[in-house]
Design a protein with these regions (language model features):
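Signature of N-terminal electron-transfer/Fe-S-associated modules in redox systems
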Residues: 1-158
Length: 158
């Protein structure tokens, strides 16, 4: 099946079976940041932005992404938003293991884009299902709050 998508800013055609996982298809198409982990959507290793929302690509059948915009961590890591998130994580003392980075970064990105400042509890509720393999929940929440503060300061200057 031929599936037109925009992958990391480039219009391409994915060649895949409709029920094949998007994670597998992206990995075959040279996206090394899309990792295979738990295959149940929990670990965050395969997280991508699908139409600007974080999703576990291991749970998405390739057949439903026709004409969608897909962003992987490889591409996103070159953005100002990524720099902001990583600055917040660094301030909180977070050292990501590399395995779950996409899940944590894209979850933070989603929270940063919320129209109103979420409460600490709302942030906690949003990220508590992520794999805690390298970062405890409280530290992750602190890192996201720091990233929000950094983003707000940049917007006031800009």
């Amino acid at each position: 099946m031929k599936i037109p998508v925009t992958l990391n800013g480039n219009k391409i055609i994915l060649d895949a079976h409709s029920d094949e996982s998007l994670m597998r298809v992206l990995h075959k198409n040279g996206c090394p940041s899309v990792k295979s982990g738990c295959s149940s959507g929990f670990c965050g290793a395969c997280t991508i932005l699908l139409d600007d929302k974080p999703v576990a690509s291991c749970k998405v059948p390739a057949g439903i992404v026709r004409n969608c915009d897909i962003v992987t961590l490889d591409y996103f890591s070159k953005t100002e938003e990524y720099t902001t998130i990583m600055s917040g994580f660094q301030k909180a003392g977070i050292k990501l293991c590399g395995y779950c980075t996409a899940g944590k970064v894209f979850s933070a990105y989603h929270i940063l884009k919320m129209p109103k400042m979420p409460t600490r509890q709302e942030i906690t509720d949003y990220v508590k299902a992520l794999s805690p393999c390298c970062t405890d929940l409280e530290t992750l929440v602190n890192g996201i709050i720091y990233a929000i503060q950094i983003s707000n300061r940049r917007q006031k200057r800009g």
